[in-house]
Amino acid sequence: MLRVAVPNKGSLSEAASAMLSEAGYRQRRDTRELVMVDPDNDIEFFFLRPRDIAVYVGQGTLDVGITGRDLLLDAKVEAEELLPLGFAPSTFRFAGPVGDFSGVEQLEGKRLATSYDGLLRDYLAERGVNAKVVRLDGAVESSVRLGVADAIADVVETGNTLKAAGMEIFGDPILKSEAVLIRRSGSGGAANGTAKEIEILIRRLQGVLVARQYVLMDYDIRKDLVEDAAALTPGLESPTVSPLRDSEWVAVRSMVPKKETNRIMDELYDLGARAILVSSIHACRI
């Protein structure tokens, strides 16, 4: 049975469970449940603190897990990223009092508060910056006001919390993060016979990603305009073209990027396409 770690709370939790549900896996109904078995798919889910997931997977206690890229790298364990999952985007940045800092070189000899000390120490060492790292478990933005630190390094989603604390972002991003699927480094699941189950999980999650990013577009168009229309809707490999009762016309079906749907529909209509319909993709395998 495949053993999978899932975030039990925070910004990763709901989105991770929703994605697994879309991929066809049973998920818990009560947030107090810590373990959930899906017998139909021979899989067991363990709901854990996002920060601990990389540790469990890196030690081989669990086969795979969903966590943040920032948490994976900060944990410094033998676990590797298998698949970016496209949700919970964030950026790990430096921030300090407005006007005090403009670049990382100004952090020499300063005190830096963070919840990601492993990640931060590596970044500073790579750039030859000698600063004192103060590890905090949360509310990092308060450390400057309380005199614990001169600046901070923290995960930023909107930046509103920093502004409210009288701070601004400076320097280049330390890391761009999102939710990722991870496994123990180099394991492949071969040791405990879960390689096939991991492959199926990855394929299903990839299908969800594609289904979220694309829609299915159908339209009718004259035969002599098919090549121009296909240039607008090339699909992943090639559009499907089917004959209609009127031999001068054909029906075309293609996957198109969801965010470009209306622009493509407008251009197809101007080209001469009619009966343009768009359908959502519930699931797919590419």
Curated annotation (Swiss-Prot):
CDD domains for this protein: PBP2_HisGL1 (cd13591)
Which pathway, per its entry?
Answer: Amino-acid biosynthesis; L-histidine biosynthesis; L-histidine from 5-phospho-alpha-D-ribose 1-diphosphate: step 1/9
- Where is this gene product found? Cytoplasm
EC number, UniProt record: 2.4.2.17
How is this protein activated or inhibited? Feedback inhibited by histidine.
Q: Which family does it belong to?
A: Belongs to the ATP phosphoribosyltransferase family. Long subfamily.
Q: What is this protein called?
A: ATP phosphoribosyltransferase
Originating species: Paenarthrobacter aurescens (strain TC1)
Q: From which lineage does this chain's organism come?
A: Bacteria, Bacillati, Actinomycetota, Actinomycetes, Micrococcales
Q: Which gene encodes it?
A: hisG
